[in-house]
Amino acid sequence: DFGRKTYNARSETVSEKPSYKHAWSKRHYALTLADAFYEPCYESGKAVRTKIRQANQEPMAIASIWDTWTEPETGELIVSFSMLTIDASNHPIMRRCHKPEDEKRTVVPLRPDLFDRWLNATPDTALALLNIDSIPELVFSE
Protein backbone atom coordinates (compact mmCIF):
# COMPACT_ATOMS: atom_id res chain seq x y z
CA ASP A 1 0.00 0.00 0.00
CA PHE A 2 1.54 3.29 -1.18
CA GLY A 3 0.20 5.37 1.72
CA ARG A 4 1.59 2.99 4.32
CA LYS A 5 5.07 3.33 2.83
CA THR A 6 5.07 7.12 2.74
CA TYR A 7 4.06 8.25 6.24
CA ASN A 8 7.74 8.85 7.04
CA ALA A 9 10.28 10.46 4.72
CA ARG A 10 14.04 10.20 5.21
CA SER A 11 15.50 13.71 5.41
CA GLU A 12 18.64 12.58 3.59
CA THR A 13 16.70 11.68 0.41
CA VAL A 14 13.49 13.73 0.61
CA SER A 15 14.60 16.08 -2.17
CA GLU A 16 15.31 13.18 -4.56
CA LYS A 17 12.58 10.58 -4.03
CA PRO A 18 9.68 10.73 -6.51
CA SER A 19 7.14 10.53 -3.66
CA TYR A 20 8.50 13.66 -1.98
CA LYS A 21 10.59 15.83 -4.28
CA HIS A 22 7.64 17.93 -5.51
CA ALA A 23 6.55 18.82 -1.97
CA TRP A 24 10.15 19.54 -0.96
CA SER A 25 10.91 21.75 -3.97
CA LYS A 26 7.64 23.67 -3.49
CA ARG A 27 8.48 24.20 0.20
CA HIS A 28 5.33 22.46 1.41
CA TYR A 29 6.56 22.32 5.00
CA ALA A 30 4.15 21.43 7.79
CA LEU A 31 4.00 20.67 11.48
CA THR A 32 2.21 17.49 12.54
CA LEU A 33 0.78 17.96 16.03
CA ALA A 34 0.93 15.10 18.52
CA ASP A 35 0.81 14.54 22.26
CA ALA A 36 3.25 11.66 21.84
CA PHE A 37 4.46 9.02 19.42
CA TYR A 38 5.31 5.35 19.85
CA GLU A 39 8.39 3.32 18.96
CA PRO A 40 9.39 -0.26 19.73
CA CYS A 41 11.99 -0.57 22.49
CA TYR A 42 13.94 -3.83 22.70
CA GLU A 43 15.88 -3.23 25.92
CA SER A 44 14.02 -6.14 27.57
CA GLY A 45 14.88 -8.41 24.64
CA LYS A 46 11.36 -8.17 23.22
CA ALA A 47 9.57 -5.40 21.35
CA VAL A 48 7.78 -3.18 23.85
CA ARG A 49 5.57 -0.44 22.42
CA THR A 50 6.98 2.68 24.09
CA LYS A 51 5.33 6.08 24.35
CA ILE A 52 7.61 9.07 23.82
CA ARG A 53 6.66 12.61 24.87
CA GLN A 54 8.28 15.93 25.49
CA ALA A 55 9.77 16.12 28.98
CA ASN A 56 7.57 19.16 29.71
CA GLN A 57 4.47 17.09 28.78
CA GLU A 58 3.41 19.72 26.21
CA PRO A 59 2.14 18.62 22.77
CA MET A 60 4.81 18.48 20.09
CA ALA A 61 5.03 19.62 16.48
CA ILE A 62 6.82 17.18 14.16
CA ALA A 63 8.61 18.46 11.04
CA SER A 64 6.61 17.26 8.03
CA ILE A 65 5.91 17.89 4.36
CA TRP A 66 2.56 17.88 2.59
CA ASP A 67 1.33 17.57 -0.97
CA THR A 68 -1.80 16.95 -3.01
CA TRP A 69 -2.45 14.24 -5.56
CA THR A 70 -5.42 13.03 -7.56
CA GLU A 71 -6.80 9.59 -6.80
CA PRO A 72 -6.80 7.90 -10.25
CA GLU A 73 -10.01 5.88 -9.84
CA THR A 74 -12.24 8.60 -8.39
CA GLY A 75 -10.55 11.84 -9.44
CA GLU A 76 -10.70 12.97 -5.80
CA LEU A 77 -8.05 15.48 -4.72
CA ILE A 78 -6.15 14.00 -1.78
CA VAL A 79 -4.05 16.02 0.67
CA SER A 80 -1.37 13.90 2.33
CA PHE A 81 1.64 14.42 4.55
CA SER A 82 4.78 12.62 5.66
CA MET A 83 6.82 13.16 8.79
CA LEU A 84 10.53 13.65 8.25
CA THR A 85 13.07 11.36 9.90
CA ILE A 86 16.74 11.64 10.79
CA ASP A 87 19.48 9.38 12.11
CA ALA A 88 18.92 8.90 15.85
CA SER A 89 22.04 6.93 16.76
CA ASN A 90 23.33 9.86 18.88
CA HIS A 91 20.02 10.84 20.51
CA PRO A 92 19.92 9.87 24.22
CA ILE A 93 16.34 8.53 24.08
CA MET A 94 15.71 7.60 20.46
CA ARG A 95 18.88 5.51 20.06
CA ARG A 96 17.30 3.10 22.56
CA CYS A 97 14.43 2.30 20.19
CA HIS A 98 14.16 -0.32 17.44
CA LYS A 99 16.02 -3.62 17.23
CA PRO A 100 19.65 -3.44 18.42
CA GLU A 101 20.99 -4.31 14.96
CA ASP A 102 18.62 -1.94 13.10
CA GLU A 103 19.35 1.61 12.03
CA LYS A 104 18.15 4.15 14.60
CA ARG A 105 15.73 6.71 13.11
CA THR A 106 13.41 9.28 14.62
CA VAL A 107 10.81 11.78 13.53
CA VAL A 108 11.84 15.37 14.29
CA PRO A 109 9.70 17.16 16.87
CA LEU A 110 10.87 20.76 16.63
CA ARG A 111 11.54 23.13 19.50
CA PRO A 112 8.87 25.88 19.52
CA ASP A 113 11.45 28.58 18.71
CA LEU A 114 12.02 26.83 15.35
CA PHE A 115 8.40 26.61 14.14
CA ASP A 116 8.43 29.81 12.07
CA ARG A 117 11.90 29.11 10.66
CA TRP A 118 10.74 25.65 9.56
CA LEU A 119 7.49 26.80 7.96
CA ASN A 120 9.23 29.62 6.04
CA ALA A 121 12.52 27.88 5.24
CA THR A 122 14.33 27.48 1.97
CA PRO A 123 15.14 23.84 1.16
CA ASP A 124 18.73 24.31 2.41
CA THR A 125 17.60 25.92 5.67
CA ALA A 126 14.93 23.26 6.17
CA LEU A 127 17.47 20.49 5.74
CA ALA A 128 19.78 22.20 8.24
CA LEU A 129 16.96 22.26 10.82
CA LEU A 130 16.49 18.49 10.59
CA ASN A 131 18.98 17.48 13.27
CA ILE A 132 19.09 16.23 16.84
CA ASP A 133 19.75 19.73 18.23
CA SER A 134 16.35 20.88 16.91
CA ILE A 135 14.52 18.30 19.04
CA PRO A 136 13.21 19.31 22.49
CA GLU A 137 13.96 17.06 25.46
CA LEU A 138 12.10 13.76 25.07
CA VAL A 139 11.26 11.10 27.66
CA PHE A 140 9.71 7.66 27.78
CA SER A 141 6.20 8.01 29.21
CA GLU A 142 3.51 5.74 30.64
Region annotations inferred by a language model:
Residues 1-142:
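A structured binding-face within diverse protein domains that lines the active/interaction site
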